[in-house]
Structure formats: structure tokens, C-alpha cells
Curated annotation (Swiss-Prot):
Origin species: Saccharolobus solfataricus (strain ATCC 35092 / DSM 1617 / JCM 11322 / P2)
Protein name per Swiss-Prot or TrEMBL: UPF0310 protein SSO2595
InterPro entries found in the cross-reference section: EVE_domain, PUA-like_sf, UPF0310
Protein family according to the UniProt entry: Belongs to the UPF0310 family.
Amino acid sequence: MTYWLVPIQEDMWDVIRDKGIYGYKENLEEFIKEGDYIIIYVSKYYAKRYGGKIVGIVKVLSNWYEDQTPIYPEETVRNKGIYIYRVKVEPVVIGECDMKKILDKIRFIEDKGQIAKYLRNAPANLKRPIPESDAKIVEECLKESLLNI
């Protein structure tokens, strides 16, 4: 069981959650495989609600495939596929976990003074998997957020 962190733009979350498809502009099959888990982090850029938060953990249900069909908001505006390398996913847990809330508990962000370098690109964390112990902390944070609704 391998966990990966990926940053997304906020408007991609609805598609990932509702259609069960995660896409990226490059093929990530070297890293993320069927059966792995993706921790979805919403970057702060242009975010209105979820910026700086982890919004879910999804399980990868397929191998990577290429699909040019525009499904994400940025793609539909341009009428062109951008995040054309895709995998089918299903939510394991959905919620809102503010990174600041768990920063002192997680190990994968080794340099707390340079948090951003661990939260960019895909997969994030400098292209390294997330330790399972950190994934469990994230999962608990997401579940706690559901209790506070």
C-alpha cells in the first residue's frame, strides 16, 4: 500500500470526486500504480474554499491511460485536454484537513521552514511516497472534519 500526495487546483476537485478520474499533464505511471492511494491537496493559488487543505484520499482503480476529452474546468474553457494522463479513482475518505493543523505531527515535511517544496509538483513530497503513518494522520484529520459539520 503506497500513498502519494498530489496538489490540484481547487476547481479540479469536483471532477475527481464526482467522476472518479484524476488527471495530470504528464504520465505518472512510474510512480502511482493501481492499488495505490492518492492524498489530494488543494493548492492555495486561486482557491476560494479549500486552499491549503487536504480534501480527500482516493484509491487508484486503474492503470494510467491517455484521454484527450476535456473534463476539468480549465480544459472545458479551452475545449482541449490538458490533464490527459488519467487514472480511475474512488474516494476512501473525504473531508477538509488544514495542513497547518497537522504540520507538527507529520514527518514527510522534513524542513518546516520550506513547506512549499513538499507540496508542489506531482507526485509531491519531492516525488517520494508519503509514509503510511503520515497517511493515517491525514485520514484521521479528514474524518474529524466530518464530525464538525
